[in-house]
């Protein structure tokens, strides 16, 4: 085949960052060898794809041959394109019916996946629709009156559309599940079973994930027809991601996080907490330190979640605090640092969290804050994953996680339009951040003190039990402060929510100190750290002082 048609393609600059064997150890195949439509090849190359990754080499030919597939590969190795490319190849644009259903567990992942479909298939003149909970059902009804070839959605909304006979899957030949382990958990499995009742018996099913528990095996035996099994998980951990832990008490975590902000070179960072309340409180504290920060969790209105996700993907802010909402499949290649502010309880959660950095075989950094209650979890995760999470050194070699040429980092596929939510619109400028995102290490002017704080009386239930917790996250706010948009902290809210910890003696009652300089006079007393910590012995340098 002549390559003249490639000459006029708008191909982005080559990604020059080093990659690990997870994506470079291939059989040397090219996308042209798969017999794909030229229009599809044009979209693939214009998206910056150069050659297939190992999972793509294994899965695309088998999917094109019509086989059911059960594929297991590491996070960030190209699983999404492994099912989107064969789906695009087999869609008949002249047939105005849903021909592919792609199910994903979260709304953010649905948005991202639909955009990959549109980007790779932009020369095919096909129609892709995304449908998730939290958006207006009538918008989906109106959209499905028009041709839709590929439907990307979350299980609950897809089942609703099918049960109401709004979406017709009776002639849909391809069924795809991404993050299949999550999709077949107790939360979703019953819904998936009901959705499949609307499909023809001779459908093709593609299941992709990084982990496959027993639930996936039972589903495969029941619903897949002699599936072709792919397992590229020779080890569970992700190559290219340097993993460290810092032993800190709860009240020292914010202090250590501030130190990391000043020492690390962060392109973009995701910070994980174990609860939605702690997500909001930590985002508020980071903003008080003078750093721009967004947050996201499952209890936020969908329109706010969409806005935060879109802004973070486009690089409008460097730091995102979130719950495990964004551990699944989210691909933002500029993220080079993941911080587990709260250490996860399971190896599966840990693996998906740190997999948000080091995408597609590139380098990344994962830092875990550990305290005494996390000893067992640390040991179990190291044992199950067969990896070592090392004590954090005083200086982390930047070559482990930094790309010197930041211009070479590919920008994410642009999301054309965000779905409208069904929640009430927020006030004017409800999503506007009242400060510009900062360069790393140079905090912007911190928010000005507000004299209208409610005082917490001495001896009251709110004040008792909170003394001595100056910077930690003991307690949690009750709801969202009035006037503070979802996901974007606006400095310090009016009043002190119940459960917010008190600050060092000498500060006015109920008024947190302002900006990084407010913490300079507060010395954290050194703590005694034992020599042994579940098999680790190098703890002498982590005695509560900044590392």
Swiss-Prot record:
Annotated region (Disordered), positions in chain: 1-27, 412-547
Main location: cytoplasm
Keywords of this entry: ATP-binding, Cytoplasm, Helicase, Hydrolase, mRNA processing, mRNA transport, Nucleotide-binding, RNA-binding, Translation regulation, Transport
Residue span, Helicase C-terminal domain: 240-400
One GO process term, biological-process aspect: invasive filamentous growth
GO molecular function: ATP binding; ATP hydrolysis activity; chromatin binding; mRNA binding; RNA helicase activity
Similarity field: Belongs to the DEAD box helicase family. DDX6/DHH1 subfamily.
Name of the featured protein: ATP-dependent RNA helicase DHH1
Originating species: Meyerozyma guilliermondii (strain ATCC 6260 / CBS 566 / DSM 6381 / JCM 1539 / NBRC 10279 / NRRL Y-324)
